[in-house]
Amino acid sequence: MAKAKFERNKPHCNIGTIGHVDHGKTSLTAAITKVLAETGGATFTAYDQIDKAPEEKARGITISTAHVEYETSNRHYAHVDCPGHADYVKNMITGAAQMDGAILVVSAADGPMPQTREHILLARQVGVPALVVFLNKCDMVDDPELLELVEMEVRELLSKYDFPGDDIPIVKGSALAALENSDAKLGHDAILELMKAVDAYIPQPERPIDQPFLMPVEDVFSISGRGTVVTGRVERGIVKVGEEIEIVGIRDTQKTTCTGVEMFRKLLDQGQAGDNIGCLLRGTKREDVERGQVLCKPGSVKPHTKFKAEAYILTKEEGGRHTPFFTNYRPQFYFRTTDVTGVVHLPEGTEMVMPGDNIAMEVHLIVPIAMEEKLRFAIREGGRTVGAGVVASIIE
């Protein structure tokens, strides 16, 4: 039988498996591909193929991530699974594999463990919109009351980190039973039930093209007789010729009008998410715009200087710092296209941060930057990346 080709006519969604080490994240990933392969919605990918994930670099950080794809009757999914705990931390903070939702895997035999808690917290901090729980290894628990107890614990933990613990679907099953065909109810049927829950509960993400227009400024030119041209890659949305836009960040917000869009030296009537364009601005001087600002739909993004962030600090082996840092540390924060100096304030009770740590911290930038929650940044010292972070919340 010829391998079924994935049709891209279904809505696409990015998800991943998260949870404590050895609770069965990779086995579950393999089990999903096995069960969905029966209906032609996936190619079965065995555990050992997923487990030896290749390394990738994102924002100067090496991360091991395995990608599998599959589809249900409703959606096409790209699914990420990471071999080690540190890979999850780095992945979620750098957004190397953006997650529109996640499957939290908890072993029914162990209940929630330290990394279960940490992954839920990270999901909250980096803005993963929704979680679905798979209570794995249920074939190892004979007592139904014990299962109920574990489920209650998981719900309480989710609520503690501001997820709707009472409403989140929890599916009980066994990834191993699905892989070994040993128990249809806990194996095959549970996987189908899980995918039904993922389909229904994880909201369909808004496509970048449907979001408000934003383009980071990469370069600025002055073209005699035409005016000022700003180049960059459109991050999201659409800009049409004749539309009013704002220039945000670094200095006071200015209004201007896009009077032309050019791509590959051709004039277009609009530029959209993913396009590398030159945008001609009416009445804007060459010195009014600089790299590091953004062009955006008026009122859609504001400039900010103070925010709370979740960050991962590279180890010395990863090319990071060799020594810890303390409150009032002043590195550069690289947002989109530019470095801005900022001062780090560590949370009370945190004396210092060691290379390899992930931490919550407060940052005060010396100039405002167009910013919103979930925006990723790199932490740099003299052009060398020493960490990565994500804006968790904005203070001012």
From Swiss-Prot:
Where does the secretion signal sit in this chain?
none
Q: Extract the ranges annotated as region (G3).
A: 81-84
Q: Where is this region: G4?
A: 136-139
Primary location class: cytoplasm
Q: Which UniProt keywords apply?
A: Cytoplasm, Elongation factor, GTP-binding, Hydrolase, Magnesium, Metal-binding, Nucleotide-binding, Protein biosynthesis
| GO CC terms in record | cytosol
Reactions mediated catalytically: GTP + H2O = GDP + phosphate + H(+)
Q: GO molecular function of the protein, one example? A: GTPase activity
Keyword Oxidoreductase attached? no
Q: Locate the region G5.
A: 174-176
Superkingdom classification of source: Bacteria
Locations listed in the record: Cytoplasm
Which residues of this UniProt protein bind Mg(2+)? 26
**Any idea which positions bind GTP?**
19-26, 81-85, 136-139
> What EC number(s) are associated with this protein in UniProt?
3.6.5.3
Disulfide pattern:
none
PROSITE patterns assigned to the protein according to its UniProt record, in alphabetical order: G_TR_1, G_TR_2
Q: Which InterPro entries match?
A: EF-Tu_GTP-bd (IPR041709), EF-Tu_GTPase (IPR050055), EFTu-like_2 (IPR004161), EFTU_2 (IPR033720), G_TR_CS (IPR031157), P-loop_NTPase (IPR027417), Small_GTP-bd (IPR005225), T_Tr_GTP-bd_dom (IPR000795)
Q: Where is this region: G2?
A: 60-64
Q: What does this protein do?
A: GTP hydrolase that promotes the GTP-dependent binding of aminoacyl-tRNA to the A-site of ribosomes during protein biosynthesis.
Q: What does the similarity note say? A: Belongs to the TRAFAC class translation factor GTPase superfamily. Classic translation factor GTPase family. EF-Tu/EF-1A subfamily.
Quaternary state and interactors: Monomer.
This protein is called what?
Answer: Elongation factor Tu 2
